[in-house]
């Protein structure tokens, strides 16, 4: 008997997931981002592995080892720039993927959605720890400020911070453990992504109309493999443009100075993809309140399936909800801008208004709009 993709145990699994998978006929380019996130993860793991071969996780030599990679290692500058900008690309794809899920009601696949939220938290943790590794000024102070937020947790907070630091400040122990976690987490993310796919293939993909597509499906290959391939070519084009022409555009100039615990940078801020959450954190003058708001800014995604009140799944035929969705997108862009600004008027009040609006749209206005649209359509 010949071994075919339909009979071989391993090939059979791959076949069901990527070749003969029944896929809705009408899914648009917004469905490309899942595969693009997978590509980003592969690029990050590959470039990260080569960086880890030359990097030393020691406070005295970490900064020098990154310089050594860029100057002395064959194509080290390219690998380092690919890894640094790959993180930005990863988050662009993630946010667009989540936005697609919200717009088209994909969050109603609860298991897939919840695993996705867990994946987002893990990717954010990995990116944060990776930012600490070059041991520049912003690496050190970013690590100090963000880990210090845990001290706001009642009773166990201060002990928890010292436990994470491995001492009384961010030092060698912190850097070593951050490197260890930064190395292992992407592999856990890859495994969890498989679980994400497993749950998705239990239900099948959603589509722009938000209705069942069981009556009209096509095989994933060759139709969507080639469609995804177009996305890959566009993505790699944008990616390599950034890597080769503007490698430092998204970075912070402060991170080109070695970490100095005696000199605080004037504006401590995380990478651009965390600025919206950082703005929400800073909008609340209370430390514990800020930390809760920071966590809730991501965790609020888990409430989408519970707060879905409309009789339609997608926003395709829901004009009020569409307006709210694009206001939410604009609000997130404003929060991202505010997160990069100093804490002074008028930025403080703009950030506070934008933070309130963010939670108001998700928790109140979206469910309300769903009910109004049901009435308008007499459903």
Curated annotation (Swiss-Prot):
Cofactor: heme b
Cystine residue pairs: none
InterPro entries named in the record: Cyt_b/b6_C (IPR005798), Cyt_b/b6_C_sf (IPR036150), Cyt_b/b6_N (IPR005797), Cytb/b6-like_sf (IPR027387), Cytochrome_b (IPR030689), Cytochrome_b_C_euk/bac (IPR048260), Cytochrome_b_N_euk/bac (IPR048259), Di-haem_cyt_TM (IPR016174)
Pfam families, sorted: Cytochrom_B_C, Cytochrome_B
Cofactor binding annotation: Binds 2 heme b groups non-covalently.
Topology within the bilayer: Multi-pass membrane protein
Residues that, per the record, bind heme b b566: 97, 196
Residues that span the membrane, as ranges: 33-53, 77-98, 113-133, 178-198, 226-246, 288-308, 320-340, 347-367
Gene Ontology MF terms in the entry: metal ion binding; ubiquinol-cytochrome-c reductase activity
Positions annotated to bind a ubiquinone: 201
Annotated binding of heme b b562, by residue: 83, 182
GO terms of biological process kind: mitochondrial electron transport, ubiquinol to cytochrome c
Gene Ontology CC annotation, any one: mitochondrial inner membrane
Places the protein is found: Mitochondrion inner membrane
Keyword set, alphabetical order: Electron transport, Heme, Iron, Membrane, Metal-binding, Mitochondrion, Mitochondrion inner membrane, Respiratory chain, Transmembrane, Transmembrane helix, Transport, Ubiquinone
Role: Component of the ubiquinol-cytochrome c reductase complex (complex III or cytochrome b-c1 complex) that is part of the mitochondrial respiratory chain. The b-c1 complex mediates electron transfer from ubiquinol to cytochrome c. Contributes to the generation of a proton gradient across the mitochondrial membrane that is then used for ATP synthesis.
Family note: Belongs to the cytochrome b family.
UniProt cross-references to PANTHER family, sorted A to Z: CYTOCHROME B (PTHR19271:SF16)
Additional facts recorded: Heme 1 (or BL or b562) is low-potential and absorbs at about 562 nm, and heme 2 (or BH or b566) is high-potential and absorbs at about 566 nm.
Subunit field text: The cytochrome bc1 complex contains 11 subunits: 3 respiratory subunits (MT-CYB, CYC1 and UQCRFS1), 2 core proteins (UQCRC1 and UQCRC2) and 6 low-molecular weight proteins (UQCRH/QCR6, UQCRB/QCR7, UQCRQ/QCR8, UQCR10/QCR9, UQCR11/QCR10 and a cleavage product of UQCRFS1). This cytochrome bc1 complex then forms a dimer.
Official protein name in the record: Cytochrome b
């Amino acid at each position: 008997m010949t071994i075919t993709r339909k009979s071989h145990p391993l090939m059979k699994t791959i076949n069901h997931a990527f070749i003969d998978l029944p896929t809705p006929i009408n899914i648009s380019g917004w469905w490309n981002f899942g595969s693009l996130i997978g590509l980003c993860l592969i690029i990050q793991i590959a470039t990260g592995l080569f960086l880890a071969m030359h990097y030393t996780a020691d406070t005295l030599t970490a900064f020098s080892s990154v310089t050594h990679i860029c100057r002395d290692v064959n194509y080290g500058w390219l690998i380092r720039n690919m890894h640094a900008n790959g993180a930005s690309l990863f988050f662009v794809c993630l946010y667009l993927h989540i936005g697609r899920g919200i717009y088209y009601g994909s969050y109603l696949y609860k298991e897939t959605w919840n695993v996705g939220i867990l994946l987002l938290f893990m990717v954010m943790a990995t990116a944060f720890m990776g930012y600490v590794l070059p041991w520049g000024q912003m690496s050190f102070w970013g690590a100090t400020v963000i880990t210090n937020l845990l001290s706001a947790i009642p009773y166990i907070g201060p002990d928890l911070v010292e436990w994470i630091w491995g001492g009384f400040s961010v030092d060698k122990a912190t850097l070593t453990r951050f490197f260890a976690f930064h190395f292992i987490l992407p592999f856990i993310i890859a495994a969890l992504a498989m679980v994400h796919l497993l749950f998705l293939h239990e239900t099948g993909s959603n589509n722009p109309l938000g209705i069942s597509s069981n009556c009209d499906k096509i095989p994933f290959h060759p139709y969507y493999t080639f469609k995804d391939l177009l996305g890959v070519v566009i993505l790699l084009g944008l990616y390599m443009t950034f890597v080769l022409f503007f490698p430092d555009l998204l970075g912070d100039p402060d991170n080109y100075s070695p970490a100095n615990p005696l000199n605080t940078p004037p504006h401590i801020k995380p990478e651009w993809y965390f600025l919206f959450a950082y703005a929400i954190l800073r909008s609340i003058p209370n430390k514990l309140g800020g930390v809760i708001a920071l966590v809730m800014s991501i965790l609020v995604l888990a409430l989408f399936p519970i707060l879905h009140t409309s009789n339609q799944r997608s926003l395709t035929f829901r004009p009020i909800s569409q307006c709210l969705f694009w206001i939410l997108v604009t609000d997130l862009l404003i929060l991202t801008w505010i997160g990069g600004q100093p804490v002074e008027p008028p930025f403080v009040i703009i950030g506070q208004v934008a933070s309130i609006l963010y939670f108001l749209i998700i928790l109140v206005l979206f469910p309300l709009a769903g009910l109004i649209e049901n009435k308008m359509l007499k459903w």
